Amino acid sequence: MSGRIDLKSVRLKTAQKYSNWLLFYLFFQKQAPFSVPSFNPEEHARIEGGTRDAYITRMHNGKGYIMVTTDMCVRKSRKWDNYGIDLLKSKDLKNWTSVTFDFRKGMQNFCDAATAQSPYKDWSTINRVWAPQIFWDPDYRWENGEKGGYMIYYSMLNRAEEKYDRMYYSYADKTFTKITTPKLLFDWGYATIDADINYLKSDGLYHMLIKKEGGKPGIYTATSKYLNHGWGEPVENDYVSFEGRKNCEGSSAFQLMDDDTWRVAYIQYSDNPKHYRICKADKYLRNFSDPVDIKGVTGPQHGSFMRITKKEYQNLLKWDKKLKE
C-alpha cells in the first residue's frame, strides 16, 4: 500500500458545496487514479513496511503537521495482525520525519516506563494496534510538571490476555517523538474499534464516533464530559445506519466553513468495490441523514480530513506537478 494525496478537490455526486472545502484528503490504497505518494511507507513503517488508517492534523501551535498511522501488515508478513503505530511530522506536508513504536517490545517503548503500570504481562503476544488518532490536550500534565500533550487513542488486542479489541490511549510529547504507557480508555464488554473524538461547542461535550464489533452494524456515538475518561456506552437509537446489514467503519467527522453542522465520512466495505461515503449530522452530531458517495475514490481505506489554506493547496499542486515531470 502507498500513501497518496488527492490534490484535486474531492467531488461528490451531490452537494457541490463540499468541493469548496474538502481540499486535502489523505488516504491509503493499492492504486490511485491521480497524484503521487505523499511519503514512502517502507521508510516510515519500520515494522511491516505498510501504512493504513492515516490521521493528520496541525500541530497545537500551528507550526507544522503531525500524522499517526497503523503500521500495517500489507507488505511483509501479509497477516491480519499488526504490532505498532508510526508517528510522523512535517513542516510542509511534503517532507516527513517519523518514529515507530513496535508494541511487541513492551515497556521500553514508553517514556514513563519507570513509574507506569503495564496493561499487559507479556507484550510479545500483541495482535493488533489499530486506527490511532490524535487530540491535543492542553491540560495534560507530565511528570516534570510541563503541561500539554497529544492524546493518541487506538484499539488494541492481546488475545493471550483479553477477549476482544478495547480502546486505549497514550500521550505524545510536544516533539511528537515519545509516548506514554497505554491506559484503558473504556471497556463496554464487547469489541470496539475506529474511534473518532471531537469536542462540540454546541453542548460542551466530547463526542466519539465508533464502530461496535458485533450487534447491529453501524457507526455509533458516545459522549463524555472528559477527554480521557467518563465514556458511557453509545446511543442505540441514533446512529449511522444507512447501510442496513452491510458493514461500515473508519468514521471521520468534520465541519465545513461557516457551518455549525457536521459531516461524517465512513467506509462501507461489504460491497466490492467498497464505498467511501459522507452523510450529514446536526450541530450536536446527531440525526444522521443524506448519505452520498465520494466520487473518484477507488479501493478506499480509513482516512481523515483536514482543512487547508489556499496557499497550502497551491503549494501542493506545484509539488505534485513537479514530481510528475
Q: What are these model-predicted stretches?
A:
Residues 1-325:
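Carbohydrate-active catalytic/glycan-binding domains of CAZyme proteins
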